[in-house]
Amino acid sequence: MRECNSCSHRVVHVYCARKEKVMSQLLEEIESLRGSMKTLNDFFFDHPELGNEEFLAHGKLTDLLESEGFTVDREVSGLQTAFRAVYHVQGGGPKIGLLCEYDALEGLGHACGHNLQGPSICAAAIGLRRTLQVPATLVVYGTPAEETASGKLVMAKEGVFDDLDVAFMMHGSDSTTVDGKSLALNLVNIKFHGKSAHAAIAPEKGISALDAVLLFFNGMEYLREHVPTEVRMHGIITDGGKAANIVPDYACTQWYIRSSSRIRLDEVVERVKQVAQGAALQVGATMEWDEVKAYDNKVNVQSLNDLLLKNAEIVGAPDISEPRKVTGSTDFSSVTFRVPGACLRVKFVGRGVTSHSQEWLDNGKTQLAEDAIMYGAKGIALTVEEILTTPGLLAQIQEDFQQSKANY
């Protein structure tokens, strides 16, 4: 049976008009939240809380989501200031993760802009809840202590994010972009134990743990030549002894070891461990390997990044730019190593202004900050709506994720 061209065009026109109406309703719903989200942002900014102590922010966000009909777990993975809020649209469907941070910096308050995230993510979640016309499960996560104890890492280890189909975050920035790659990280304290003695009267009776540390540093310099060029290894001495006239029976050095590949990093870490064991052996000390935390690398899903950045441009986010080529490590990678995920970074400071600075802090309650909250919410919400309403798009993103992960 031959399809009538005029009917086909009419069907397409009706579909596009309906989709445009849904998008317009979604954006209008989010915009209607501007005033309340600004109030929330300003409250967070004026009441900065350190990691795992974000009780005020936790209370504000969970109360808000509960008032919108979300079912809220107010403690997750043993973290008192973590939460999980769930809403099933039309009985539930693909699980969409929306993550936010809200911890501040000691002495600098919200100089990393985490005050923006909760309002932006909640605005996206509420807008979607009120307007979505297809089955979906919206899951908002409060993830504490990004700056210190890495709440997402704790939650990821317990499988909290494993059932998500896709995950999103928002962060302030000096331009509007998406996160590219991030580096896998192992943060370790390497502790050497020796034997104390009087350094002048009987040094031969001592075993210097500090000597082991110094030998370890020398060994690391030789190791650098034999690891991939993208590997980063940097360390400090955190304890070198108590007095110069005592042979130190204890010394400690802390190291950050990074690579763009978790598999490659695991291999390098084993070699670092051998260097430490060798340093201890040379002086007769013992070595204790204390791993503080380990981040995976972010798995980059180009199709998802492109989609998110396209929608950020559609909603008018300023100063669109390509992803950063050089980056550090983040606990969000503990999520994106498990499920497809993307972080939309929205401009609210001038180009070249870095986070953890006074200038970044000074912009926390400006009009630019308020606008960034809205741009982030709208860009992420439009992306979620497009994924849920475009046949095959989610499956393609998940396939791209698996292929990208296989390349690391």
Language-model segments: which ranges?
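Buried hydrophobic packing segments
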Residues: L61, S120-L128, G151, A212-M220, ...
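Metal-dependent amide/peptide-bond hydrolase catalytic core
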Residues: L214-Y408
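Phosphate-handling active-site elements
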Residues: V72-D73, G93-P94, A125-Y141, M220-V231, ...
